Amino acid sequence: MRPDVQWRLCWENELQLPDHLELSEFFRKTYEPTGAFNGKQFEGGRSWAGARPELRVIGYDVHGVAAHLGLLRRYIKVGDVDLLVAELGLYGVRPDLEGLGIAHSISVMYPVLQQLGVPFAFGSVRPALRNHVSRFCRKGLANILSGVRVRSTHPDVYLDLPPTRVDDNVLVLVLPIGRSMSEWPAGTLIDRNGPEL
């Protein structure tokens, strides 16, 4: 049975403290099973991990936050080409709803991407999530690119780490919005020029 989820589209400035606290708890519970540090970054009411989203789609059911997807418009560099994208990140589905088809409802974001007029949306995920994100590709909304490295800055300054990191083991998800996929630049390195969303 598909859960009854109501979707809320909100700009970051519209969120109030109770919203951040509820989202922080949601992210801790959603991300902790993938590693203790992954959940720890959401302590203290923090509802973002790296870059802060400008727009969020939040799904609610009778138990609270059921799903979330964040969006941030930014310029990235693909190979030698600067490219405006809407980065998608902070994706999560409450663990008790995994496998119930709620991920398909995240397509609520697609009309928003069209309204924003960006040429592409992009995000990166661990290879373990290939089957999960491939659901978006079945409808023809997205493409998965492998063999692409993504360079990002750390969200904070760490004295024992360089200021940037390169993820060699990620899948890049690209959604053609205002352009066709054939117009996505060739390149094996994407430079975020900032922290991951």
Swiss-Prot record:
EC numbers on record: 2.3.1.-
Annotated keywords: Acyltransferase, Cytoplasm, Nodulation, Transferase
Gene Ontology molecular function: acyltransferase activity
Localization per Swiss-Prot or TrEMBL: Cytoplasm
Enzyme class: transferase
Residue runs in coiled coils: none
GO cellular component: cytosol
Record-stated family: Belongs to the NodA family.
NCBIfam families noted in UniProt: nodulat_NodA (TIGR04245), PRK00756.1 (NF001974)
Function according to Swiss-Prot or TrEMBL: N-acyltransferase required for nodulation. Acts in the production of a small, heat-stable compound (Nod) that stimulates mitosis in various plant protoplasts.
Protein name as annotated: Nodulation protein A
